[in-house]
UniProtKB/Swiss-Prot annotation:
Gene Ontology biological process: translation
Assembly notes: Homodimer. Part of the ribosomal stalk of the 50S ribosomal subunit. Forms a multimeric L10(L12)X complex, where L10 forms an elongated spine to which 2 to 4 L12 dimers bind in a sequential fashion. Binds GTP-bound translation factors.
Lineage: Bacteria, Bacillati, Actinomycetota, Actinomycetes, Kitasatosporales
Alphabetized UniProt keyword annotations: Ribonucleoprotein, Ribosomal protein
Protein name: Large ribosomal subunit protein bL12
One Pfam family in the UniProt entry: Ribosomal_L12_N
Domain of life of the native organism: Bacteria
Family according to the record: Belongs to the bacterial ribosomal protein bL12 family.
SUPFAM superfamilies xref list: ClpS-like, Ribosomal protein L7/12, oligomerisation (N-terminal) domain
GO cellular component: cytosolic large ribosomal subunit
Gene3D superfamilies, per the entry: 3.30.1390.10, Single helix bin (1.20.5.710)
Reported function: Forms part of the ribosomal stalk which helps the ribosome interact with GTP-bound translation factors. Is thus essential for accurate translation.
InterPro entries: Ribosomal_bL12, Ribosomal_bL12_C, Ribosomal_bL12_C/ClpS-like, Ribosomal_bL12_oligo, Ribosomal_bL12_oligo_N_sf
Amino acid sequence: MALTQDELLAEFEGMTLIQLSEFVKAFEEKFDVTAAAAAPVVVAGGAAGGAAAEAEEEKDEFDVILTGAGDKKIQVIKVVRELTSLGLKEAKDLVDGTPKPVLEKVNKEAADKAAEALKGAGASVEVK
C-alpha cells in the first residue's frame, strides 16, 4: 500500500532534525540527487511583484550561526552533534572554527529551537 502525500508529511512532522537530516542523505544517495537541486527557482515577474516574493521567501529560511563556544565547549559540541548529523571530530572542528553556520535554510521554529539549545549549552549564536 502506497502512502499518500499527507501521510508522508505527517510522518516527517514527527521526526527530529537529526532524523530528517539522515533521511535526506539517504534519499540523495538512493536517487542520486541533491537537496540543493530541489530549491525553488524565482522567476522575475513585475518589479514590485518579484521584489515582494523575494522578501517573503527570505523570511521563511533562517541560518543558525555559531559565533562562539563560550566556557562549556564540550556541551556545545554535544548540542551541535544533536542538531546535525556530524561526527565528533567534525562537530569539534565546527565549534573551534567559529563563526560557522550550524544549520542553514531552516524554518523559524527550527532555527529558534536550535539557537535556544546552543545558548543553553553556553554558546553565543546568531539567527539570520
